[in-house]
Amino acid sequence: MTDEEAIGRVIDAMYAMVSGPKGPRDWSRQRDVFHQDARQMRTGLDANGKPWIKIMGLNDYSSDTRDFFAQNDFFEVEIGRRIRVFGNIADAWSLYEARTAPDDTNPERRGINAIQFYRGEDGRWRIMSMIWDNERPGLKLPDLG
């Protein structure tokens, strides 16, 4: 398996972990996907157009999203991907749509997960950091072509 294929499997597992009908998520898979020191960062703009960021560790993210996932069907579906590898580091831009059903043709939102990876001593790729932002007026997804 190539590095790109292995990283692709990590990305697929990350989306599978957060996607599903309303109800709890299986966070036990987090340690296979994310490095123990990983950070996840949600970004956006406030009502005045000022940028904000929320930085979370693994436990912070699962706690932060618990109520949302308990009350909402949520499927994050990848619609594009670009991976670059250099030695034991890699990055990916993963374009996504957030949907209420996997086959929903009218997504609630679209955005980019910018993901950084590290290949550890065990040879496995894991996410070290992931930062994301959503489309909004004046900000459209790029063509990764």
Identify what each model region corresponds to.
Residues 18, 34, 96-98, 131-133:
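Short beta-strand segments enriched in hydrophobic/aromatic residues
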Residues 51-53, 102-106, 136-144:
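A short, polar/proline- and glycine-enriched secondary-structure boundary/capping micro-motif
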Residues 61-63, 109-112, 142-145:
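Non-catalytic cap/lid and distal C-terminal segments of serine-dependent acyl enzymes
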Residues 36, 79, 111-113:
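Residues that flank catalytic or metal-binding motifs in active/ligand-binding sites
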Residues 1-36, 145:
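Short, low-complexity N-terminal intrinsically disordered segments enriched in polar/charged residues
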Residues 31-49:
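Early exported N-terminus immediately downstream of N-terminal targeting peptides
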Residues 91, 110-141:
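Short beta-strand edge/turn micro-motifs at domain boundaries
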